[in-house]
Amino acid sequence: MQTLQVDLGERSYPIYIGAGLLDRAECMVPHLAGRQVAVVTNETVAPLYLERLSQTLAGHELTPIVLPDGEAFKHWETLQKIFDGLLEARHDRRTTLIALGGGVVGDMAGFAAACYQRGVDFIQIPTTLLSQVDSSVGGKTGINHPLGKNMIGAFYQPKAVVIDTATLATLPERELSAGLAEVIKYGLICDEPFLGWLETHMAALRALDAAALTEAIARSCAAKARVVGVDERESGVRATLNLGHTFGHAIETHMGYGAWLHGEAVAAGSVMALEMSRRLGWLGEAERDRGIRLLQRAGLPVVPPAQMSADDFLGHMAVDKKVLGGRLRLVLLRRLGEAVVTGDFPHEALQATLDTDYRTLMEQISH
């Protein structure tokens, strides 16, 4: 087992990484506030792992709260089901919520923990690659609104993150690829040598090689922990973690939450960010193409939806958390391994990026 630390003073917490951690009570029990535990999970994950977790926490008063699965259910009505379960089982302020599932479960359980009786403790047990390398670390919680993704939420840190890498054995291939989008992101924004490692090990990662996955998860979590420790509330460098997300959130919102997985939308959005960085003269074609090829090798979509116009993108991007004073800011790349958050770009460069024929571009890159 590896242990990393998110350094936030009195609110610091560990990230445990290893196979079989669902059975390791010592990773969870020290972080429980009291005897009451509510496990928030979904209809897909519950049959796989809920019983094992219940056995690990034997001796505690455990309330399972099983939600419908998917981004389409990341809204107020589903959040209300968590509160219903807590209140019906008479959970008090010394309860601990455990999020057992992917990013949707983690975001909603964390938001419920932030709100319930004005704040109770919670633990993240992420079971998808995307949630293990990204959403479970850093305390971003929330739900979607019909007009924009993750627009309602709170910064609320967990007491621990427990990453059982063995849960990836049950992950569908499409979900694995979606998680790789966020892994690749770390290489693009802050760790260029990691891109080389990913190019070497991509086949092993997609084949669920345990050693390769553990290394990728640890490097990703370490990168995120460093950024969160410096900028918890995204006033500066943390925003670089949103590479591809402004374009990607527009895709998710326009296409209907769940039609594209979050990682798929981030991949297509990252391609657009790479292209815009090239148009601004920061990346050469070879650097842009290197990033795109890696996303392709991960089995990810690299072409935005054909039915989305430039105006569709601009309309959704106006409702983005990085908009300040009415000005759109984007995460772009000065070079591979160095990201910047900027609103200082000519609109023509953005318009040209949105107007690019990405299907033709991919044909050129593949020849």
Swiss-Prot record:
Any Gene Ontology CC annotation: cytoplasm
Catalytic activity: 7-phospho-2-dehydro-3-deoxy-D-arabino-heptonate = 3-dehydroquinate + phosphate
EC number: 4.2.3.4
Cofactor: Co(2+); Zn(2+); NAD(+)
Record-listed NAD(+) binding positions: 69-74, 103-107, 127-128, 140, 149, 167-170
Chain coiled-coil ranges: none
InterPro entries: Dehydroquinate_synthase, DHQ_synth_AroB, DHQ_synth_fam, DHQS/DOIS_N, DHQS_C
Protein name: 3-dehydroquinate synthase
